[in-house]
Amino acid sequence: MGGSGNWIRSLISNRKPVNDQQEKLSDKSSKKKWKLWRISSESLASSSFKSRGSYAASSLGSELPSFSADEAFTTAMAALIRAPPRDFLMVKREWASTRIQAAFRAFLARQAFRALKAVVRIQAIFRGRQVRKQAAVTLRCMQALVRVQSRVRAHRRAPSDSLELKDPVKQTEKGWCGSPRSIKEVKTKLQMKQEGAIKRERAMVYALTHQSRTCPSPSGRAITHHGLRKSSPGWNWYDDVGTFSRKSSESSVLSEYETVTVRKNNLSSTRVLARPPLLLPPVSSGMSYDSLHDETSTSSTSQSPVAFSSSVLDGGGYYRKPSYMSLTQSTQAKQRQSGLSCNGDARRSAGSDQCTDLYPPGNVWAKSQRS
């Protein structure tokens, strides 16, 4: 009996430190923080081992009547032990994946913000004044280029159109009528029209030339000559401009020389002046010209022709001819006879008359101006 009493006493004396150890473990578990990255499988095993040891101790102490206060704690630990163990490696991977996704989404957001700012800047640049001005200039240049291209194409098509117009068959095709005619009849009709047009042109030319022969003024001849050129089919205004410029240049060069005819007692003489004379007043037949000019040659019935190697001027009023183109005596006699019938005043003149002279001298215009 003594041995059994000692055993009970030793059990009762060892009861308090066991309870103190359980309280300390409960306090530590309550104060401990839940950290995923510090928990491992070893800590889980140690905690399970401690819980089992405490459960064994509590089971031993449950036999005593004073151990009923710790039943709630023991039931909770039992439930924790029965629960399946959680894989903390998967938890770490999920946490790392969320961190990576957040960083990548932040990077995409920054990139989109930069692109948006660039788009806003580009819009501001395109809506600026300089860009609009440059665009307007470029549009004008493109329009000018299109106009030039259209003109070049029209110029290229012009020769083909002219060839088509010259071809009588194509003309007949364009002006085709529904009347029953053969090709020969159409061609003969076209030929008759062309011949009639040629005859009309010849008649106009003949009338103009006849009028120019009867007209004594050189301005009338210039007008008729211009009309002849203008009525011709190959007339072009650019050619008239070129001839006018050439005539003006030649007249400026040849205006340094001028012919003056002086009459004194039915004796005529021709002078050559270095410069064109001024507008002289009408002089009577008895006045002397010795103070103005020196006579070099006199003739009672003919004038001495002036030799020039310059070209003939048809619009300036001065007609000049080279020495080899002067008329012979027989030609002058014929012209004198025709001049008597053309003009009664030509009997008193010593030179050839202008109305029938093919190569009129340069002093005719001066005579007509003085008369």
UniProtKB/Swiss-Prot annotation:
The keyword Disulfide bond does not apply. Residues 93-121, 122-144 form the IQ domain. It comes from the Eukaryota. Residues 1-32, 285-308, 327-371 are annotated as: Disordered. It is found in: Nucleus; Nucleus envelope; Cytoplasm, Cytoskeleton. Keywords: Calmodulin-binding, Cytoplasm, Cytoskeleton, Nucleus, Repeat. Residues 125-141 are annotated as: Calmodulin-binding. Pfam families: IQ. One of its GO terms (molecular function) is calmodulin binding. One of its GO terms (biological process) is cytokinesis, division site positioning. GO terms for cellular component: nuclear envelope; phragmoplast; preprophase band. Coiled coil: none annotated. Residues 17-29 have a biased composition (Basic and acidic residues). InterPro entries: IQ_motif_EF-hand-BS, P-loop_NTPase. CDD domains: IQCD. Residues 297-308, 327-341 have a biased composition (Polar residues). Binds to multiple calmodulin (CaM) in the presence of Ca(2+) and CaM-like proteins. Belongs to the IQD family. May be involved in cooperative interactions with calmodulins or calmodulin-like proteins. Recruits calmodulin proteins to microtubules, thus being a potential scaffold in cellular signaling and trafficking. May associate with nucleic acids and regulate gene expression at the transcriptional or post-transcriptional level. PANTHER family: IQ-DOMAIN 5-RELATED, PROTEIN IQ-DOMAIN 7. This is Protein IQ-DOMAIN 7.
